[in-house]
C-alpha cells in the first residue's frame, strides 16, 4: 500500500498503531486489576485523559473547551463511558484477553441497533441479517445452557452495551460540543466518579503500583493521540473496520504474556462477529 494509491494510508497506519497501544494497555491492566480495584486504575486513566485534554485544546488553539452547550447529554455520555470502562477492565480479572475483546467487539453492531431504536435511523434487511449473525457468534462463544458456560462472559457484554450507548450519546453531543470539550469532560467526570468509588473500594498500594499507573496512563494517552490523529486524516467510516485489529493483539499478547490459547468456539465466534461487523460498516457506508 502507498500514499498515492490510498490517500488514507497514514490514517489507517495511525489507527492500527492506536489499537496496538490499547492492546498493550489492556495487557498491563489485566495484571494490574489483580492487585488494584477497577476504580483505582480508571481514576489514573481518566486523570491522564483530563491532563491530555489540556494538551489537545492548547495544540488545536481551542480556548473555551471547558464550556459545554449541552451539559445533560455531556454528563450522560461521560457516565456511560465510565460504566463501559468499569465493566471492560473488570472482565480482564476473570477472562482471557481474547474472550473479553471478542465479546466487547459486539459494540459496533449494538450501535446500529440503538441507532435504529434511539436515532430512528433506517437499517436495511441485509444489515439486520448481519446483526443477527453477529449475535450467533456471541452465543457460540458464551455457549449458554452448556456445562462449560462462563457467567463472567456477561461482563464484557455489558461493557459492549454501555459503549454502544456511549457512542450514541457522543453522536448526539457532537451536534453541540467540539471534540476538545468532550475529551475534557470525559477526563473530568470520569476522574470524579472513579475517585469517589476508589475511596470505597480502596486496595493497598504496592511498590510496583506506580509503575503500573505510569504505563497505564502512557499507553492510554498514546492510543488516544494516535486515534485522534487518524481521525483527522481519514473518515471514521474508513477506519471503523480496523477496530477489530485489537482482537489480534488480544490473542497475541494473551498467548505471549498469559499463555492463553483461545478455543475453537472463541475463534469461530470471533470470525463471525468480525465478518458481520465489517459487512455492516462497508454496506452502511455505500
Q: What do the predicted segments below correspond to?
A:
Residues 100-106, 173-189, 224-255:
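Helix-helix packing/entry segments at the starts of transmembrane helices
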Residues 2, 49-69, 136-148, 190-209, ...:
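Membrane-interface helix-cap regions at the ends of transmembrane helices
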Residues 9-18, 57, 63-87, 151-159, ...:
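Loop-to-transmembrane-helix transition segments
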Residues 88-90, 107-129, 201, 248-267:
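C-terminal transmembrane-helix exit sites in multi-pass transporters
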Residues 32, 41, 91, 97, ...:
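Hydrophobic/aromatic residues within transmembrane alpha-helices
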Residues 35-83, 162-165, 185-200:
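Transmembrane alpha-helices of multi-pass small-molecule transport proteins
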Residues 126-142, 265-284:
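Hydrophobic transmembrane alpha-helices of multi-pass small-molecule transport proteins
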Residues 1-40, 148-172:
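Glycine-/small-residue-enriched transmembrane alpha-helix faces in small-molecule transporters
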Amino acid at each position: 500500500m502507498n500514499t498515492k494509491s490510498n490517500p488514507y494510508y497514514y490514517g489507517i497506519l495511525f489507527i492500527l498503531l492506536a489499537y496496538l497501544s490499547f492492546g498493550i494497555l489492556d495487557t498491563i491492566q489485566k495484571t494490574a486489576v489483580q492487585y488494584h480495584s477497577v476504580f483505582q486504575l480508571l481514576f489514573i486513566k481518566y486523570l491522564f485523559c483530563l491532563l491530555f485534554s489540556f494538551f489537545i485544546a492548547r495544540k488545536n488553539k481551542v480556548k473555551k473547551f471547558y464550556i459545554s452547550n449541552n451539559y445533560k447529554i455531556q454528563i450522560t455520555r461521560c457516565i456511560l463511558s465510565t460504566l463501559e470502562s468499569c465493566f471492560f477492565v473488570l472482565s480482564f480479572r476473570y477472562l482471557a484477553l481474547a474472550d473479553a475483546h471478542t465479546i466487547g467487539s459486539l459494540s459496533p453492531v449494538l450501535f446500529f441497533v440503538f441507532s435504529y431504536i434511539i436515532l430512528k435511523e433506517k437499517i436495511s434487511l441485509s444489515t439486520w441479517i448481519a446483526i443477527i449473525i453477529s449475535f450467533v457468534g456471541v452465543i457460540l462463544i458464551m455457549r449458554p445452557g452448556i456445562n462449560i458456560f462462563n457467567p463472567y462472559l456477561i461482563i464484557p457484554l455489558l461493557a459492549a452495551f454501555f459503549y454502544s450507548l456511549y457512542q450514541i450519546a457522543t453522536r448526539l453531543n457532537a451536534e453541540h460540543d467540539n471534540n476538545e470539550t468532550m475529551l475534557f469532560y470525559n477526563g473530568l467526570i470520569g476522574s470524579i466518579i472513579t475517585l469517589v468509588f476508589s475511596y470505597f473500594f480502596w486496595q493497598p498500594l504496592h511498590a510496583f503500583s506506580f509503575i503500573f499507573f505510569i504505563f497505564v496512563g502512557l499507553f492510554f494517552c498514546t492510543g488516544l493521540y494516535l486515534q485522534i490523529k487518524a481521525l483527522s486524516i481519514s473518515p471514521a467510516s474508513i477506519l471503523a473496520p480496523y477496530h477489530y485489529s485489537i482482537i489480534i493483539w488480544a490473542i497475541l499478547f494473551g498467548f505471549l504474556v498469559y499463555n492463553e490459547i483461545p478455543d475453537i468456539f472463541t475463534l469461530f465466534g470471533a470470525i463471525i462477529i468480525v465478518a458481520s461487523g465489517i459487512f455492516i460498516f462497508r454496506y452502511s457506508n455505500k
